[in-house]
UniProtKB/Swiss-Prot annotation:
Compartment list: Cytoplasm; Early endosome; Endosome; Recycling endosome
Coiled-coil region(s): 185-295
Role played: Endosome-associated protein that plays a role in membrane receptor sorting, cytokinesis and ciliogenesis. Involved in the endosome-to-plasma membrane trafficking and recycling of SNX27-retromer-dependent cargo proteins, such as GLUT1. Involved in the regulation of cytokinesis; the function may involve PTPN13 and GIT1. Plays a role in the formation of cilia. Involved in cargo protein localization, such as PKD2, at primary cilia. Involved in the presentation of the tumor necrosis factor (TNF) receptor TNFRSF1A on the cell surface, and hence in the modulation of the TNF-induced apoptosis.
Residue ranges with Polar residues bias: 159-174
Free-text comment on this protein's domains from its UniProt entry: Tne N-terminal domain is necessary and sufficient for basal body localization and ciliogenesis.
Chain positions covered by the region annotation Required for interaction with PTPN13: 100-125
Major localization listed first in the record, in broad terms: cytoplasm
Entry PTM: Phosphorylated.
Record-level GO BP terms: cell division; cell projection organization; positive regulation of cilium assembly; positive regulation of protein localization to cilium; protein transport; regulation of cytokinesis
The family this protein is said to belong to: Belongs to the ENTR1 family.
Source species taxonomy: Eukaryota, Metazoa, Chordata, Craniata, Vertebrata
Protein name: Endosome-associated-trafficking regulator 1
Species per Swiss-Prot/TrEMBL record: Bos taurus (Bovine)
Record-level GO cellular component terms: centrosome; ciliary basal body; early endosome; midbody; recycling endosome
Length: 359
């Protein structure tokens, strides 16, 4: 039933929606890998509904053959010779799911994509025109999709010669009608159950979508906050890097200066060591000279002492000689004084004699 042509101009009621979350490509893979996901649920239910619909279609075709008096081995194209040309089978949705889903499509703008399960497409594809008879609904249900073109051009029924006993104006038998109604009710109940299940699943998915959207917004805000923090941290790290680079350059310059100073200091130390060695040699020479001088000074002192002793002795001798000469001079002076006195007394005596003679 999922392969029927879709009626143009009719909005499909099974338009599924998928949440598109940016930068999260793994969500679809995780949902596809989850056996309890909504897709797996729809796939299982669609398989069961397709199998059940196939069985009911086979059973309905057999019942139609039996009620119309056709052979069991006749082909499917001759089973129903009505010549109806519908575009696809149409069933009215008794629950009004089309309006509800159309309102939901207007409310939800954030959904996109399309996922068309066969059960929903089978149920809510199109509606039959108002002029179509109730019997044609069941006829379209039991007919092949290729034989259904549309309700506008309905030629009169054309039956084969073997089936000429069936009149196009005649009504179906009671068994056929009851069987068709039971199949329609059964199919309607199945569709209602599937619709309720899909509705519950849709509400759950909406709640889950709301939670995912809030979680996505929270994660987006967190990512933005982390991006801002990361940018600030990167700016700070870049400034720290530039500061550290300048500090490293200064340290390298200081190391070069210290290296040059260390080389100069080593050269200066070598010169000082050479000078110290020279000074030590000079000190040793001075020590030897001092010792030599000390030894020579002792010898000269003895000589000087001897010379001074000799000089003292000579001085004493000279003093003694001087005293003796001085004594001699004094005695000679006294003698001279005595001679002078004698001479004076002689002169006086002669003068007295002269005066006495003159007188």
């Amino acid at each position: 039933m999922a392969g029927y042509a879709r009626r143009p101009g009719v909005t499909p009621l099974s338009r599924a929606r998928s949440l598109v979350i940016p930068d999260d490509d793994k969500l679809g893979d995780l949902e596809a890998a989850n056996p309890f996901s909504f897709k797996e649920f729809l796939k299982t239910k669609n398989l069961s509904l397709s199998k059940e619909d196939t069985d009911s279609r086979v059973y309905s075709q057999e019942a139609t053959r039996h009620s119309l008096g056709l052979d069991r081995t006749s082909p499917a194209s001759q089973t129903v010779g009505y010549g109806l040309e519908y575009q696809q089978p149409f069933f009215e949705d008794p629950t009004g799911a089309g309006d509800l889903l159309d309102e939901d499509e207007d409310e939800e703008d954030g959904w996109n994509g399309a996922y068309l399960p066969s059960a929903m497409e089978q149920t809510h594809s199109s509606r039959v025109a108002a002029s179509t008879s109730p019997c044609s609904t069941y006829v379209s249900f039991f007919s092949n999709p290729s034989e259904l073109v549309g309700p506008e051009s309905l030629p009169p029924w054309t039956l084969s010669d073997s089936d000429s006993r069936i009149s196009p104006t005649g009504s179906p038998s009671a068994d056929f009608t009851a069987h068709g109604e039971s199949l329609g009710d059964r199919h309607l109940r199945t569709l209602q159950i599937s619709y309720e299940a899909l509705k519950d699943e849709n509400s759950k998915l909406r709640r889950k979508l709301t939670e995912i959207q809030s979680f996505s917004e929270t994660q987006t805000e967190m990512v933005r906050t982390l991006e801002r923090k990361l940018e600030a941290k990167m700016i700070k790290e870049e400034s720290d890097y530039h500061d550290l680079e300048s500090v490293v350059q200064q340290v390298e310059q200081n190391l070069e200066l210290m290296t040059k100073r260390a080389v100069k200091a080593e050269n200066h130390v070598l010169k000082l060591r050479q000078e110290v060695s020279l000074l030590q040699a000079q000190v040793s020479d001075f020590k030897r000279e001092n010792e030599a001088l000390r030894s020579g000074q002792g010898a000269s002192l003895t000589v000087v002492k001897q010379n001074t002793d000799v000089a003292l002795q000579n001085l004493r001798v000279v003093m003694n000689n001087a005293h003796a000469s001085i004594k001699q001079l004094v005695s000679g002076a006294e003698t001279l004084n005595l001679v002078a006195e004698i001479l004076k007394s002689i002169d006086r005596i002669s003068e007295i004699k002269d005066q006495g003679e003159e007188s």
